[in-house]
Swiss-Prot record:
Alphabetized PANTHER family for the sequence: 2-IMINOBUTANOATE/2-IMINOPROPANOATE DEAMINASE RIDA, PROTEIN HMF1-RELATED
Catalytic reactions of this protein: (Z)-3-aminoacrylate + H2O + H(+) = 3-oxopropanoate + NH4(+)
Keywords: Hydrolase
Name the UniProt record assigns to this protein: 3-aminoacrylate deaminase RutC
Keyword Isomerase (UniProt): no
GO cellular component: cytosol
Biological role stated in the UniProt entry: Involved in pyrimidine catabolism. Catalyzes the deamination of 3-aminoacrylate to malonic semialdehyde, a reaction that can also occur spontaneously. RutC may facilitate the reaction and modulate the metabolic fitness, rather than catalyzing essential functions.
One Pfam family this sequence matches: Ribonuc_L-PSP
EC number assigned by the record: 3.5.-.-
Domain of life: Bacteria
Length: 129
């Protein structure tokens, strides 16, 4: 079995389910699906897709930085949104966090684990060794 390192940023809350915020294996960082939760797993920025997107990307940034990387190391994002009406607001914030070369990604509409959550993002990054 390939050695892996569990990545949990300092001050993180306890996940709702049995998973880690991030896993690093062989230079590849996998960031779990991330929602706009506070440390008690309450949704923040209710009704605000841009605010939730910013919160999610800041959380992902924290996980990757804890492992020694940066958002520039992200190669793929999986984006889940509850309604296409939020697509423009999400993309506006997303572009602020990825101003240069953009990672590959997909975006689908679906239900999320909490009704007030509007967006979830999972990421893959390749960290420098």
């Amino acid at each position: 079995m390939m050695p892996k390192t569990i990545i949990t940023p300092p001050g993180s809350g306890t996940p709702l389910a049995p998973f880690s915020p991030g896993t690093l294996a062989d230079g590849v960082m996998y960031v779990s699906g991330t929602l706009a939760f506070d440390k008690q797993n309450n949704v923040v920025h209710i009704g605000d897709a841009a605010g939730q997107t910013r919160h999610v990307l800041e959380t992902i940034k924290s996980v990757i930085e804890t492992a020694g990387g940066s958002l520039d190391d992200i190669t793929f994002n999986s984006i889940f949104l509850t309604d296409w009406q939020h697509y423009a607001a999400i993309n506006q914030v997303y572009a602020e966090y990825f101003p240069g070369d953009k990672p590959a990604r997909f975006c689908i509409q679906c239900g999320l684990v909490k009704p007030d959550a509007l967006i979830e993002i999972a990421s893959v990054a390749h960290l420098p060794r």
